Amino acid sequence: MQGLLDWVEKRLPAMNAYKKHLSEYPMPKNFNFWYLFGSLAMLVLVNQILTGIWLTMNYVPSGEGAFASVEYIMRDVEYGWLLRYMHSTGASAFFVVIYLHMFRGLIYGSYQKPRELLWIFGMLIFLVLMAEAFMGYLLPWGQMSYWGAQVIISLFGAIPVIGDDLTLWIRGDYIISGATLNRFFALHVIALPIVLLLLIVLHVLALHEVGSNNPDGIETKLPKGTMGDDYKTQFPFHKDYTKKYDIIDSIPFHPYGTVKDMVGVAGFLFLFCYVLFFNPEMGGYFLEPPNFEAANPLKTPEHIAPVWYFTPFYAVLRAVPDKLLGVVAMGASIVVLFLLPWFDRCKVRSYRYRSKLHLINIIQFTISFIALGVLGALPATPTYTLLAQIFSLGYFMFFVMLWFYSKNEATKPLPERVTFK
């Protein structure tokens, strides 16, 4: 058996790749709670792929059969209800862990040099994930699915010159119909998952090229030959590790990182299963009541709002009275996230060693983003619209203020070694 494994290893160095990118990957030893969400995102991705495959076996991608096929899955397919709820709950769980993953990058400066490309790959994953969720949202062919897609797709019509043609191309018809459903199904099941998986591979490769950031925002890599003896004393089981990697204050991902992540996975699965079995609709935020009615082009729901993970950007859109300018503002609210590495001109990464102004700016940005998420799910009354305008201003002011104060920001001295605050 060992001879066969050696033969395969010489032709396909899978074990070397496993050691380099997983078991012996150098992980800063002061990783904390905020460093769980990358692994959790991978776990949810596996859940979405597996449950999606099973749902596809019984789903009918046509205007006549889509809603009925979902009802069939829920009522007649053995454990079909469980698979459907695992997929719908998983979609929201995906965005929960992704938003927390992005927030960790924000507070610890994981977007700064030399990790700009790593951040961009992460933002591209977020963008594709939003497209994937939007395409999948139409597939149940319920009332909110239909009219939510109608509202979002119509926004492209506001783009000058190409707007009408672009809207027609996205829909595949002059109205949202079975042709739109077929198109979205193909993109949701085949095209976008391929792009998503490719971007995840690039994201991981970029991470392993520059190394992981840590809560202190300092590098753990040192010139060759400078590894301290304290590492061998603390982790005698990995004496050979120091011969391969000249990295101080780091530990192998396995078993230390895997054990840490397993604790997070256990906590996550507890919460996930609680929602799955006791509150899968989550009060209408995960699965809206109108979506249990078949799509009816002649009956508009009283209040149309996207799923919760789109509402912050939807609130920015509604905050601007002009349709075209609203689309521009919504697009800008996503584009500025891509440009974050160049807005922040400070040499210090982590908020721990930056000014109080920076901490206040992060807090007001977080409050603005959450408030926009709440307002985006509410009706567009004059009061809510005014609040959305105020919080939209706060959202964009984060980036403007960051660019101004970060250049000459008063920072605290950085530690020479990682700390365990």
Regions found by a protein language model. Name each.
Residues 1-93, 97-421:
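Membrane-embedded and interfacial regions of multi-pass energy-transducing membrane proteins
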